[in-house]
Swiss-Prot record:
This is Type 3 secretion system translocon protein SctB. One of its GO terms (cellular component) is host cell membrane. It comes from Yersinia enterocolitica. Its main location: secreted. The core secretion machinery of the T3SS is composed of approximately 20 different proteins, including cytoplasmic components, a base, an export apparatus and a needle. This subunit is involved in the formation of a pore, called the translocon, in host membrane. Interacts with YopB/SctE and YopE. Together with YopB/SctE, forms a multimeric integral membrane complex with a mass of between 500 and 700 kDa. Interacts with its cognate chaperone SycD. Disulfide bonds: none annotated.
Amino acid sequence: MTINIKTDSPIITTGSQLDAITTETVGQSGEVKKTEDTRHEAQAIKSSEASLSRSQVPELIKPSQGINVALLSKSQGDLNGTLSILLLLLELARKAREMGLQQRDIENKATISAQKEQVAEMVSGAKLMIAMAVVSGIMAATSTVASAFSIAKEVKIVKQEQILNSNIAGRDQLIDTKMQQMSNAGDKAVSREDIGRIWKPEQVADQNKLALLDKEFRMTDSKANAFNAATQPLGQMANSAIQVHQGYSQAEVKEKEVNASIAANEKQKAEEAMNYNDNFMKDVLRLIEQYVSSHTHAMKAAFGVV
């Protein structure tokens, strides 16, 4: 399109479809001077680029149904409500996981405590066995010492009896020798009692001592037997008491072992609950992501946004 403009000064006029510019100048004598048409190259380039860009942009499909603002507000409210519920479920799962962590820590401590108590009871049982061995050793040593004293005393008594018996036998032999001598001399009127009257006090004294020693020997032997008879039940009672305590200790060990097993089982349950809560949290997050994505696609489709 070409526009001719008459004016006192040069005027340039453009339009949406202007492809040339004509300049006319009116002089003082009224003569119109026409200049050559000049083509607007920049405008032509811009117009070609605009037409090219319009040809590359796809045309959007116009929705066949208009947007209902009320339904849009309701949809937004439903989205917010659903997201609130899902977020609440996520928070509950997180709290449950925290409780599971605390429960697992508690069960770990309970397991460790039960194992420590079990070890302590086993150590106590070992100490009781050592105590039983010590008591048995003490009783055996006491009995041995008492027997040794008794034997030493009896040996001493036996030696004294041997000396006394030797003295008595020696005097009897002297009496017999004296009797033989007097019989050989023809003096048969002297009796054995008359000859033995000289050593009779020593004989009687030695015989009395011998009787006392024999009595003392029997008493010493009886005391040793009585002491052994008394110490053996005491040792047996001590061993029985230790065995009873050892039985209690073994029962405590079994109980602690059961408690440790229960604590380990509870720990496993807590770990399983934690795994379940983790999976539940992942599922909730996946649902939130899917729900938001679906709602976003729906809104884009409603507004015609690609």
